[in-house]
């Protein structure tokens, strides 16, 4: 069973929906408006926005645009998926990842959104075109490559809320012994201390 997947979908009807996510999600609005409700506040996302949804309940409303259906592309992933991809990017390509960004938005919300930068916008537009190909939906390797590319584009970008939320998801997987060893591989520490 695949641990993450791509989902592109359209919506014609409008209603507030409760979504209970068991994985993290990163998405992009291709057309329409998305409202995310949190208590008595409403955040508006429009065409060209990239967004992050954390695990848990989200109250969302998707609006069509000018008679055309609402359209978005979503990637779902687990902390283990993210950890595996980041380790691959670091070991294979030497990608050093850091993040100094922290703001009230990142700390207190289970969702964040921002206008997409050029490379991420192009990525999602191309991914949407790939999703129109039926064979793509059955190609796990293509999905893995797309997910790795998405993580790279976010992790290599300047510090921002999306990057901060994404990288905070690795912490949930840090209990993994392999990750602990990897974290200490260049430190003067014994195997006994690691265990």
Predicted regions and their residues:
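Short acidic/polar alpha-helix capping motifs at helix-coil junctions
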Residues: 1-2, 23-27, 126, 141-145, ...
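N-terminal regulatory/effector-sensing and dimerization cores
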Residues: 2-99
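Small-side-chain structural scaffolding
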Residues: 25-27, 168, 195
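Juxtamembrane/interfacial segments around transmembrane helices
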Residues: 74-80, 105, 127-129, 173, ...
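Alpha-helix boundary/capping residues
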Residues: 89-92, 127, 184
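Short, Lys/Arg-enriched, Trp-marked, Pro/Gly-tolerant hinge/linker segments that flank
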Residues: 98-118, 131-193
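Amphipathic alpha-helices that form helix-helix packing interfaces
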Residues: 120-123, 127
């Amino acid at each position: 069973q695949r641990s993450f997947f791509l989902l592109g979908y359209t919506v014609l009807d409008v209603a507030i929906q409760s979504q209970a996510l068991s994985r993290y999600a990163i998405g992009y609005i291709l057309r329409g408006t998305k409202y995310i409700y949190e208590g008595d506040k409403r955040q508006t996302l429009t065409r060209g926005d990239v967004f992050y949804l954390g695990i848990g309940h989200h109250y969302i409303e998707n609006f069509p645009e000018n008679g055309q259906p609402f359209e978005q592309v979503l990637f779902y992933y687990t902390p283990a998926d993210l950890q595996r991809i980041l380790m691959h990017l670091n070991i294979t390509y030497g990608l050093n990842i850091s993040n100094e960004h922290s703001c009230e938005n990142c700390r207190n919300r289970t969702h964040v959104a921002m206008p997409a930068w050029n490379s991420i916008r192009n990525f999602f537009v191309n991914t949407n075109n790939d999703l129109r190909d039926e064979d793509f939906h059955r190609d796990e390797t293509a999905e893995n490559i797309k997910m790795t590319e998405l993580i790279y584009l976010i992790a290599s970008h300047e510090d921002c809320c999306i990057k901060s939320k994404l990288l905070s998801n690795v912490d949930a997987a840090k209990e993994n012994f392999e990750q602990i060893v990897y974290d200490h591989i260049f430190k003067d520490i014994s195997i006994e201390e690691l265990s």
